[in-house]
Curated annotation (Swiss-Prot):
It is found in: Secreted. Belongs to the pyrokinin family. This is CAPA-Pyrokinin. Myoactive. Its main location: secreted. PROSITE patterns: PYROKININ (PS00539). One of its GO terms (biological process) is neuropeptide signaling pathway.
Amino acid sequence: SGGGDGSGMWFGPRL
């Protein structure tokens, strides 16, 4: 988790 795809990234549905 990190505001991204749920893997601690920053790229995904929560861009």
